[in-house]
Amino acid sequence: MLDPSQAEVDQDILKSSVVQGALEKVKAYQSTVQKMKAGLDADPQLNIKPAIVKELDFASLRDTLKTLNTAFEEDTQRGTDRLIRVILQDITELETANAQKDGVPRSPRRLEIMQGKLAKLDKAFGDYLAFAN
């Protein structure tokens, strides 16, 4: 299921402190992505790897998304699982696109790729959060 308006959500699980904590973390992840995009817009040569590694820690992010996912019924989870895979893949690709040699400026094409990944991540987080609303 990919339509949040049709999502089946267990409200008791969603209201639990563990899932509410995960929900807040997912919102913070989306905010981090938005800040990275703004930083890259302001400075096309900005190295965002420290933020990716620290703020979007792969294992922690995956666990947080899966914790929030427990509030959704099985059919809904099929759609949200797909979004989780997209988010994790895009973070991996963003980290790869960010890599560059010292002293070599980032090319316009690489900048475009990174901005595209950040925009896609922002949308994916928004789409995922829509299931919890």
Question: Can you annotate each of these PLM segments?
Answer:
Residues 14-72, 90:
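Alpha-helical segments in soluble extracytoplasmic regions
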Residues 19-25, 32-36, 90-133:
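C-terminal amphipathic alpha-helix
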Residues 52-113, 117:
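Long, amphipathic, charge-rich alpha-helical segments that form helical bundles/coiled-coils
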